[in-house]
Amino acid sequence: MLPANRKKLAGLLVILLAGLTLVLWWAHAPNASLRTVLIPDTYAQRREVKWPHRGQIFDRNDSLLAYTGPRYLLVLPRRKWLDSARFNRLLNWPDSALEARVNDLRRRELPMQLNLTVSEADTLRRHCREWPALTVREYTARNYTVHVAAPVLGYAYNAAQPFLYQAQRLARGRFYRLRNGGLETYYNTLLAGHRGAYHPLLDALNQRHGSWATDTTYQPGQDLHLSLDTELQAYAERIMGERKGYIVALEPATGEILCYVSAPTYDPAALTALSRGRERSALLLSPDMPLLNRPALQANPPGSVFKLVNAAVALQLRAITANTGFRCDQSLINCVHEHPNAHNLTQALKYSCNPYFYRVLQSVVEYIPDTLAQPVDTCAVRHQNLAAWTRHVKSFGLDTLLGVDLPREKSGFVPLPAYYDRRYGRCGWQYRTIYSLSIGQGEINLTGLQTANMLAIIANRGWYYPPHFVRSVGTSGAPLPRFRQKHHTLVDSVHFAEIIPGMVAALGHGGTAELASLADVNISVAGKTGTVQNDEGDDHANFAGFAPADKPKIVVAVYIENAGFGGLSAAPCAALIMEKYLRGNIAPKRKRWENWLRCGNLAEQGH
């Protein structure tokens, strides 16, 4: 090799060794500031977004109810022939299944799309070369593992846009009444979490040098652990069948809702599934209004169940005592069945004597203390007494929002003296004008949640926690703070102890709720029947009670429209719910009731 070439080669080797030495020194430089000597002071702006995963929903036994995951749609070709028989065999579908599913789709939905299971989607992907005209589309959606508790689970508004559009177009005036987002809407902020947006300034070595914009903190979606007992919920929906009404069951010691049925029922996935538009239309246009959240939004006269509150308030105001007796004078008001005169409050509750409670409220409204000077202004006294009665009644959580964790609820209605003043004039009304309040009729209206909460107050001897569905948010192990605040009524606890014996007697021999007795399985039940008058058809059946009577673990309120006497339909229904929750199974003698109650009352079945 020539000397000149050797010199060039040696020079190149020296340069390479010097460069390698510089790189090694650079990587291990003790002072980072030394690295900036040869680098210009310029940075790259980057935006990084971290999206949270929506929280899951579990029941009280930690069974998964709702989660976000993949779904699959089969997009059918518009004008290409498809061998349906071969297609059905491929997916193990029955003969003509494809034609039936296509016919169920609304004609205006183009292209036609069918829901697929995971296994069906995998099968089509494996055979995609044999079916080039078919497309399997994957998208992320909310999945429900159960077909119950639709008004409770609800929907997120961004996922229910097709339903909301249909509701505004088809339901028109009923849209607001039928809209109910459930827990998915009420806890949307907690379930959805918050995306994190980061704005780092990066140098040539990809090292961060602060932020070029304000960062937002990432918050993952939190899980919800409900108080709902899914097994009890499914059982309650099954025995209600297609009848109209509601069932609310809660734990009185905590206010946790165990069961919440608004009948007729529907599948919670129906409102958000892309291919179920026809089903949504049927739900919106149904005259039975299955989308109406009845326990929270339908306020009705409570009927004779309200006699419990009237008795408690009269005891507190000293208008009566537990030993007060009144004759069953049907010249005042009719009594629906024959029974002996009630010589005390226990007997009056057992027989649900209308004339007795007519006299009870009359004793409250027309009570004149001996200390008042004569002559007495009876109009002023009547206003004062009714105002006191209203104040005590409202302390039971009536005529107010209980604050349940649902987007919407009604407050019900309890009339004030001013209501009757506007209607009849200040002194234009007397007790005879308002006597219907004594038996839970007339102007008073309660929701199903209020009825159940009213019985929880009696079970607790005068206090309650607001009813709620979520017993734990995220990993906190606790509900929202406001659901841990105890509320007290204006009635002393001693007076509730005077009411409960009559509620127990109502389920004994000769009582109005004898069919709801669980004495054969050693469970003592306390309750009260109600038959709500209906001028447009059959009366509505009502019952509310709790068990065991001495240490209540469950409160149940049942309201069945057009079912007649409460003791023949609503009371047996409540008994089944209590027995299912407390024992886990139903005694053989009551097992046959399950199908009977789906279509009528026990009297119609020859019980």
Explain the meaning of each model-derived region.
Residues 66, 203-212, 253-305, 309-566, ...:
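Beta-lactam-recognizing serine transpeptidase/beta-lactamase-like catalytic domain environment
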